[in-house]
């Protein structure tokens, strides 16, 4: 495709060829309207892995509800150092007892509210985890650990948490522009669509956050739940990854993958991971490719309101990737032609490589970042496009004029020849 430069550092992850497992077939991947996760962990027990092999514990669902902050047992008290602890009363007061006016949204693991905490003088987003789900407890532990160890401008900042009795709450920095999903899909009347430049900026920011998880975090982390609703937008359309409850420590040393239960969101899950349960860094790259396609096309990763062959974004796009003549048909119609054709071709080439069926054919995220940084820095100006169009139209007019003049000259020559013959 020619859009990927080579990174100076050797950071390519090795991937194994995946084979079908009889225990995991596509039939198990069903869409649940009430919850967008593909599968749920067993309600009998749950393995909570902290910082890879630092600490592992098996807890029953009943025991999980009794966990307190001290029970997370984090090495070197990293949580205490980097994340504040809040009482449930403090967070309740900050949201007006979680009143509806403060409600921001709801995800697979709980509800999110906007609040103001006086003791830190800051507006925050507070996620109250679902107390009835074993998944929510695991998410709480993993997310606190991941964000306590992470430090990157393209990852949402964890301010603190509350683990009091049966209550589990996470406190984040507040993102005033909501999620990417709010800006791409089902736009309310009068809301302007994202400009091309903004879309590429968001894509590059999300890719940088993913690159940090894969290549800088120690140990490296596989995000496992990259989707538009988990990309939050700060002022200036600065993208930040959020919701790390499904994150897993990636393969290390000679390992090529992590074997795990398949979890994620339908439409974003890599086919190799869905079939085998073998999770790799390339699984995240596939999910990123789906997000990039959403940014380019304006379509949802999975839309059951469309005809059967067009419900899956990747299945719809794959046949169109084969011929560049189709590329303009793929762009979001809300852009109304306001995009650079060359930039569109390059962005679609990147997306096409990311959603390759075989993980070995997908690029590493560092190469994706390099390509998208170039696209994001190439500012598109509509007036420049109009000038280009005017130049093209002028050339066409000139060619038509030259053709017409040439025809006139031929006709004049023929008339002269006829007159000459008659005179003779």
UniProtKB/Swiss-Prot annotation:
The top EC class, named as a word, is: transferase
Signal sequence segment: none
Give the EC number(s) under which this enzyme is classified. 2.7.11.1
Q: Which reaction does it catalyse?
A: L-seryl-[protein] + ATP = O-phospho-L-seryl-[protein] + ADP + H(+); L-threonyl-[protein] + ATP = O-phospho-L-threonyl-[protein] + ADP + H(+)
Region of interest called Disordered, as start-end residue ranges on this chain: 1-26
Lipidated residues (S-palmitoyl cysteine): 3
The chain positions of domain Protein kinase read 98-377
Q: Where is the lipid attached (N-myristoyl glycine)?
A: 2
Catalytic center at which residues? Answer: 225
Localization, UniProt: Cell membrane
UniProt modified residues of type Phosphothreonine: 87, 260, 265
State where ATP binds: 104-112, 127
One GO molecular-function annotation for this sequence?
Answer: protein serine/threonine kinase activity
Phosphoserine (modified residue): where?
229, 259
GO CC entries: plasma membrane
Membrane-protein topology: Lipid-anchor
Q: Name one Pfam family in it.
A: Pkinase
**What SMART domains has UniProt attached to this entry?**
S_TKc
Q: Which UniProt keywords apply?
A: ATP-binding, Cell membrane, Kinase, Lipoprotein, Membrane, Myristate, Nucleotide-binding, Palmitate, Phosphoprotein, Plant defense, Serine/threonine-protein kinase, Transferase
Give an example GO biological process. Answer: defense response
InterPro entries in the cross-refs: Kinase-like_dom_sf (IPR011009), Prot_kinase_dom (IPR000719), Protein_kinase_ATP_BS (IPR017441), Ser/Thr_kinase_AS (IPR008271)
Where are residues bearing Phosphotyrosine located in the sequence? Answer: 172, 273
What role does it play? May be involved in plant defense signaling.
The entry's family comment says:
Belongs to the protein kinase superfamily. Ser/Thr protein kinase family.
Question: Any idea what this protein is called?
Answer: Probable serine/threonine-protein kinase PBL6
Q: Which organism is it from?
A: Arabidopsis thaliana
Lineage of the species this protein comes from: Eukaryota, Viridiplantae, Streptophyta, Embryophyta, Tracheophyta
Report the gene name.
PBL6
